[in-house]
């Protein structure tokens, strides 16, 4: 995933994109056969990325249902995974990213959805749901909330000043130490997403991003260690505002974050021009899911909330706000035209062909990536 203005777009050319492969409280009781809990029936506990719903999304649900939504935030998929795999999280709805979602399903972390309580599933694009069914057979445990890409967001003027003739269409922009050293003067931020970023470095090195050997990971570590002195921050929650304010000039992040940053800069009338690129070497495609933890205190309310989010007007408002594509048909008339036609949100066909989906890591590989990432984060 991702974070806070209206959730963006539906899927323009969605089917074609997917064919080619183109990122708290409440009492806890045991599940009944129906999957419902005996928690506070007037409450829903939501665990989500920051900046990942429209300003009125939750308030409108509360007004419509009388259910109070308690929101908590996570900043990495690893943090979410630790909570749901440990159990007794107290959450009713969470937003995992595939392929973390696949591993969590296998571990028994989620309730099967009661689709009789989700009539708005008919509004979703079958091609998108078929794509994520590779991780969740029959879409039994989750609903697509948003999808998008990893890439590089940049402040056009600041980058041009710091690095004339910058290779904007290549990962060399941030993974080459000579370039990173020049850009350090205006600020580089990296997404705190170990498995994703490691795969992007592998792609940059011309290696298979989903079949890394121990030597491949050593090569990734070498790349990251050389650029670490020039990376100002490694934080998934700051890039939107930092880019909009001109506090940083380059960020490795999610596409929708830069749509939001661009919008905020425009609202502020500060003259900041924010661009986004999917590097020529290729990049990651991600899906964020709505799911219900197996021990959710308020599973009935969770179904109500997920169904509400799949209402066409609700999800369109979210998409228009957060700058990410949703699981509806891109032809939806409810989307802002600027979103539906935005190449940052819906990549052109030539860019679609360069996108790949992250496979699930073995426990051994996951531990190796975590160790590598911790070295990167703690080194200066």
List the predicted regions and their residue ranges.
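Hinge/lid segment of periplasmic solute-binding proteins
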Residues: 38, 102-149, 166-175
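A bilobed periplasmic-binding-protein/Venus flytrap-type ligand-binding module shared by bacterial periplasmic
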Residues: 153-158, 203-206, 286-298, 317
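Ligand-binding pocket segment of bilobal, Venus flytrap-like solute-binding proteins
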Residues: 189-201, 205-277
């Amino acid at each position: 995933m991702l974070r806070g203005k209206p959730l963006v777009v539906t899927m323009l050319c969605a089917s074609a994109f997917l064919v080619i492969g183109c990122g708290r409280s409440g009492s806890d009781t045991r599940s009944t056969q129906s999957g419902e809990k005996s928690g506070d029936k007037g409450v829903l506990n939501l665990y989500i990325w920051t900046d990942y719903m429209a300003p009125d999304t939750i308030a409108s649900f509360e007004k419509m249902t009388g259910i109070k939504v308690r929101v908590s935030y996570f900043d990495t998929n690893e943090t979410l995974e630790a909570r749901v795999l440990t159990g007794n999280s107290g959450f009713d709805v969470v937003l995992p990213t595939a392929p973390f979602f696949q591993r969590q399903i296998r571990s028994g972390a989620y309730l099967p959805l009661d689709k009789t309580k989700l009539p708005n599933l008919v509004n979703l694009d079958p091609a998108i749901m078929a794509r994520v069914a590779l991780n969740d057979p029959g879409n039994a445990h989750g609903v697509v909330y948003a999808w998008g890409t990893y890439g590089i967001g940049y402040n056009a003027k600041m980058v041009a000043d710091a690095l004339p003739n910058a290779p904007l269409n290549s990962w060399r922009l941030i993974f080459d130490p000579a370039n990173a050293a020049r850009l350090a003067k205006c600020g580089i931020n990296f997404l705190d997403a170990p498995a994703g970023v490691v795969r992007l470095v592998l792609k940059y090195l011309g290696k298979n991003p989903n079949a890394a050997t121990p030597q491949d990971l050593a090569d990734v570590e070498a790349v990251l260690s050389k650029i670490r002195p020039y990376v100002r921050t490694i934080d998934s929650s700051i890039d939107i505002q930092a880019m909009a304010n001109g506090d940083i000039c380059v960020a490795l992040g999610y596409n929708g974050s830069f749509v939001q940053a661009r919008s905020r800069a425009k609202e502020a009338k500060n003259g900041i021009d924010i661009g986004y690129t999917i590097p020529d070497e290729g990049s990651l495609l991600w899906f964020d899911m709505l799911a219900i933890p197996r021990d959710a205190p308020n599973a009935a309310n969770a179904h109500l909330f997920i169904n509400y989010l799949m209402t066409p007007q609700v999800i369109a408002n979210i998409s228009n706000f957060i700058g990410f594509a949703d699981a509806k048909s891109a032809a939806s008339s409810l989307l802002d035209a600027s979103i539906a036609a935005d190449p940052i949100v819906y990549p052109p066909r030539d860019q679609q062909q360069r996108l790949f989906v992250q496979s699930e890591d073995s426990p051994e590989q996951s531990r190796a990536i975590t160790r590598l990432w911790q070295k990167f984060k703690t080194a200066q």
